[in-house]
Swiss-Prot record:
One of its GO terms (molecular function) is G protein-coupled receptor activity. GO terms for cellular component: plasma membrane. Residues 1-23, 78-98, 157-193, 257-267 are extracellular. Glycans are attached at N6, N18. It comes from Homo sapiens (Human). Odorant receptor. Disulfide bonds join C95-C187. Keywords: Cell membrane, Disulfide bond, G-protein coupled receptor, Glycoprotein, Membrane, Olfaction, Receptor, Sensory transduction, Transducer, Transmembrane, Transmembrane helix. SUPFAM superfamilies: Family A G protein-coupled receptor-like (SSF81321). The lineage of its organism: Eukaryota, Metazoa, Chordata, Craniata, Vertebrata. The chain crosses the membrane at residues 24-47, 56-77, 99-118, 138-156, 194-217, 234-256, 268-287. This is Olfactory receptor 4X1.
Length: 305
């Protein structure tokens, strides 16, 4: 099907039509986005420069932090810039590209979180075989699988939408291009595509969440036979990961597991998985991990790690 598009650009409603309020919101997003880039960037650089943070856990954490920067960068800079110039507009091609990129990095993050859960399972439940299983080749393969999974998810979410005609209206009640608000602008029957989106996005969010929770229940069951010191260290690492998982997957499930209808609350819910999770990632992982904190202090202090 060849799409006939009378719409060449899309206008975002955003959070508010009051420009004073919008400017305050844009300043808040600017501060949060700056913190996302600096915090996650510091984790990436610290791990790359460190001679101590060499375990697979930190290898995966560096990739997760890099993906968080990319994920947040898909929509935050444009939202901030548009708010200051008072023109919340994006081209149709730009909108579709933003939607594809958002789901690519979001899907990659979801798969990386599952990879990190598997890494913790092997480290805690099979410590004697950990380095043999999680060798350099396996770590590289798991990262490539995460990127590939994110790409397949994004293609599955957006390919059919790229074929739809858009003939008006062109006003989107959101602050970035996502599948639900984009489908509402299409001049065609989107029922079948909506089902595919629920199956793809919703199932990945829900299934991934329950698989991750199940893996941590297995770890908790295994830890009952460990001493208190070992339990505390393992639980501290797992608690950090579970917190990130909850902040990311619960809001995603609320948005993508239901029919493709945009609700006013979607904009607030979306803030959690597009900004809040990337913002809290460095706080959760660094503040609860003595090795990361010490490595950061040495790196910032200009010492050899």
């Amino acid at each position: 099907m060849v799409a006939t598009n009378n719409v060449t650009e899309i206008i975002f409603v955003g959070f508010s039509q009051n420009w004073s309020e919008q400017r305050v919101i844009s300043v808040m997003f600017l501060l949060m986005y700056t913190a996302v880039v600096l915090g996650n960037g510091l984790i990436v650089v610290t791990i790359l420069a460190s001679k101590v943070l060499t375990s697979p856990m930190y290898f995966f954490l560096s990739y997760l932090s890099f993906v968080e920067i990319c994920y947040c960068s898909v929509m935050a800079p444009k939202l901030i810039f548009d708010s200051f110039i008072k023109r919340k507009v994006i081209s149709l091609k730009g909108c579709l590209t933003q939607m594809f990129s958002l789901h690519f990095f979001g899907g990659t993050e979801a798969f990386l979180l599952m990879v990190m859960a598997y890494d913790r399972y092997v480290a805690i439940c099979k410590p004697l075989h950990y380095m043999a299983i999680m060798n350099q080749r396996m770590c590289g393969l798991l990262v490539r699988i995460a990127w590939g999974g994110g790409l397949l998810h994004s293609v599955g979410q957006t390919f059919l939408i790229f074929q739809l005609p858009f003939c008006g209206p062109n006003i989107m009640d959101h602050y970035f291009c996502d599948v639900h608000p984009v489908l509402e602008l299409a001049c065609a029957d989107t029922f079948f595509i909506s089902l595919l989106i629920i199956t793809n996005g919703g199932s990945i969010s829900v299934v991934s969440f329950f698989v991750l929770m199940a893996s941590y229940l297995i770890i908790l069951h295994f830890l009952r036979s460990h001493n208190l010191e070992g339990q505390h260290k393992a639980l501290s690492t797992c608690a950090s990961h579970v917190t990130v998982v909850d902040l990311f997957f619960i809001p995603c499930s609320l948005v993508y597991i239901r029919p493709c209808v945009t609700l006013p609350a979607d904009k607030i819910v979306a803030v959690f998985y597009t900004v809040v999770t990337p913002l809290l990632n460095p706080v959760i992982y660094s503040f609860r991990n003595a090795e990361v904190k010490n490595a950061m202090r040495r790196f910032i202090g200009g010492k050899v790690i």
